[in-house]
Amino acid sequence: MYKYILKRLILLIPVMLGVTLLVFAIMYLTPGDPAQLILGESAPKAAVEALREKMGLNDSFFIQYLRFVKNAIMGDFGRSYTTGREVFAEIFARFPNTVVLAVLGVIISIAIGIPVGIISATRQYSLMDSFSMVLALLGVSMPVFWLGLMLILAFSVKLGLLPSGGFDGLSSVIPPAITLGVGSAAIVTRMTRSSMLEVIRQDYIRTARAKGVAEKVVINKHALKNALIPIITVVGLQFGGLLGGAVLTESVYSWPGVGRLMVEAIRQKDTPTVLASVVFLALVYSVVNLLVDLLYAFVDPRIKSQYK
């Protein structure tokens, strides 16, 4: 088990190098001068050039990237061009808000997706099955930003029940959490149905039914337990994705999370903040995936033998 964890952690190194190189190249090629943005449009050219030299922006691409990697290894990701604060201080201040959205989104997706998926599987080809699959297809296909705008229009503009954005107590969490949860619930529903259908066709399920075991026991104890592995995979990936990719939702609702911080940094060509955000979110996503893989061993002990 420990060797497996060590291997996964070592594999993170080339992944992080590739991710940071790609993002660094994109920011390098993006039009705009960070020094000019910091000093303002009216700043003298001499002052801008002096700041560029001080920031090392006149160096070649690879020199700048290697300097970033060296500093990152030492734990120094620099300071934000716009606020002057250490970038990880900015990220840690906003990350709890992103976690709140991700956790609520996953709770909504599990609360809706697993029960609906089980019902669809046990009533295959019924009206309920067809209706739930149509809704799941709509949920998967629906753009996040469109759903977010429709919820704002309905509950904030028309009904006035919920705030349209920002962070102002529990009521402000509900719309973005629903926006995230709907898409994830659709994916969890489809995976639960598919996994349950595969399991309930197995011989041991037929045997349990032939012995007169109650249908609820067959479904909830025997079938669902063995169908959990792919469901856990999807839920884990959804949680990691919500932690690292709730950018659109946070932007639509002006939610003060890491995703919105990264969008603001991209607009302002705040390279240190963008790079630190990408590194942080990539690490979070990778760690969540590792934890999901390790969770398999507790659901199915047979998998423990593979973690060597």
Regions found by a protein language model. Give the residues of each.
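Alpha-helical transmembrane segments of integral membrane proteins
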Residues: 2-3, 89-128, 167-308
